């Protein structure tokens, strides 16, 4: 797994978020592996809302993996943090 969000393309990160959202059993066969993915999401995004982005969406955004990625991308840009790698 990649250690920084800047190592992901936006598409790769969206796929990661989709796998968490759907609890993809091929990617996360156990509850523990799913929990670890959620914790990795929190670490990668550095967003103050953490996993709440996944489970308690802001009323002003789409409740979907794409909405999560958009919010993370916009928040990181507003804080001057690195974004996704080109690709």
Curated annotation (Swiss-Prot):
InterPro entries: Colicin_E_sf (IPR035900), Colicin_pyocin (IPR000290). The lineage of its organism: Bacteria, Pseudomonadati, Pseudomonadota, Gammaproteobacteria, Pseudomonadales. This is Pyocin-S1 immunity protein. Pfam families: Colicin_Pyocin (PF01320). The keyword Methyltransferase does not apply. Belongs to the colicins ColE2/ColE8/ColE9 and pyocins S1/S2 family. One of its GO terms (biological process) is bacteriocin immunity. One of its GO terms (molecular function) is toxic substance binding. Keywords: Bacteriocin immunity. SUPFAM superfamilies: Colicin E immunity proteins. The keyword Transit peptide does not apply.
């Amino acid at each position: 797994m990649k250690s920084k969000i800047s190592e992901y393309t936006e598409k790769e990160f969206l796929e990661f978020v989709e796998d968490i959202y759907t609890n993809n059993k091929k990617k996360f066969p156990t509850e523990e592996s799913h929990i670890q993915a959620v914790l990795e999401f929190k670490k990668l995004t550095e967003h103050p809302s953490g996993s709440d982005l996944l489970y308690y969406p802001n009323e002003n955004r789409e409740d979907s993996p794409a909405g999560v990625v958009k919010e993370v991308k916009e928040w990181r840009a507003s804080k001057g943090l690195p974004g996704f790698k080109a690709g």
